[in-house]
Swiss-Prot record:
Compositional bias segments (type: Basic and acidic residues): 1-13
Chain positions recorded as a divalent metal cation 1 binding sites: 295, 297, 307, 421
Catalytic activity: S,S-dimethyl-beta-propiothetin = acrylate + dimethyl sulfide + H(+)
Cofactor note: According to a report, does not bind any metal ion as cofactor. A crystal structure complexed with 2 Fe(2+) ions has however been observed for an ortholog, suggesting that it binds 2 divalent metal cation ions per subunit.
Effect of residue 295 to A: Unable to generate dimethyl sulfide (DMS) from dimethylsulfoniopropionate (DMSP)
An annotated Gene Ontology molecular function: protein homodimerization activity
Root EC class: lyase
Family that this chain belongs to: Belongs to the peptidase M24B family.
Protein name: Dimethylsulfoniopropionate lyase DddP
Amino acid sequence: MNQHYSETRKIDPSRGATLGDNTPNDNNRIEIGPTQLAFGEWATAGLALPDLQRMREFRWNRLTQAVVDRDYGGVLMFDPLNIRYATDSTNMQLWNAHNPFRALLVCADGYMVIWDYKNSPFLSTFNPLVREQRFGADLFYFDRGDKVDVAADAFSNEVRTLIAEHGGGNMRLAVDKIMLHGLRALEAQGFEIMEGEELTEKTRAIKGPDEILAMRCAVHACETSVAAMEHFAREAVPQGNTSEDDVWAVLHAENIKRGGEWIETRLLASGPRTNPWFQECGPRIIQNNEIISFDTDLIGSYGICVDISRSWWVGDAAPPADMVYAMQHAHEHIMTNMEMLKPGVTIPELSERSHRLDEQFQAQKYGCLMHGVGLCDEWPLVAYPDQAVPGSYDYPLEPGMVLCVEAAVGAVGGNFTIKLEDQVLITETGYENLTSYPFDPALMGR
């Protein structure tokens, strides 16, 4: 068999040494990223690409400054999304979420060390900000059995040595999520353990210019994927024998096609299964002239979360009047609440001034008015007035924050729930709704 050079070459000569996002134009590279399909769609849409080298440096600088500002020796992270934020590297993210084998230490001088799976230390080598790759942070029972304490002692000693060298010997160490033996071992080394999530969540809350560009690209890819799902649903459901899972599978596939990574939940339901909300997507056959409601919770291109929700009426008959009213009411709810968004407004003020849903929808209203979003659902959370805890979120909004504004509108004992959600950027002067996906005109009564 003849093998042609065009089939094996590593670089596309039409693109130069780097792609438009300033990552290597190498077909065999280690780091993951958007696909050619995604790049082509973004170019057609006129979207500017992020500079990933600059984005990584921005994130690293924010983390390092956060450590210094709090007078810590460093921050030790096990959460795979905190590690993604700091290094932009991934390794079996969902498996890692319940088997924490990865750890990352950012010291007060910016020195960054990752502990990775021993067979794949190369997965972060594309990022020069990661100065060392080690292994040995897997402190869970499956991996260590009855000798977890021995591994934890060795790991904690490495952390102590690194903080002595790169954290000024400051024994105040922020930690986000850690297994029990790891915590005990760090304390035995003399560390004062500080709340790492407070540091990482507030650091991640402000998005830099390149993160915002990456999010715009991710939103476009998500909305394109949602459009494919809607097209499939409207074509297939009236023909019969199309399940919720069939529809949901389209979003998964379209996300992966564009370099997206996973979907956090299974929040797509149809007909009476939409009420109460939070029933998971399943094998139910969707009937003609029924509602479909969903929440993307999608980790998409560049690892950016796009968290939007829509409800569709699928069929040839008109939706019932009470459903149209609920849709209009939900739309009014999120749009009225969105109008409050601007720098300087505090989270308690957002709660206090929020639009009030009708009494019939109070019992099953959503768990929050708004929440932050970046690599996943993030800090802060804006609670409904009757659920707000005084003192828990006494902070103002700042430019660069991104919030999801949402509503779940369905009456107790009803046969539907409307689910709506848009993703919104806080600007210097107000807000910008990053979401452009249309609302179902039939449900809007148009």
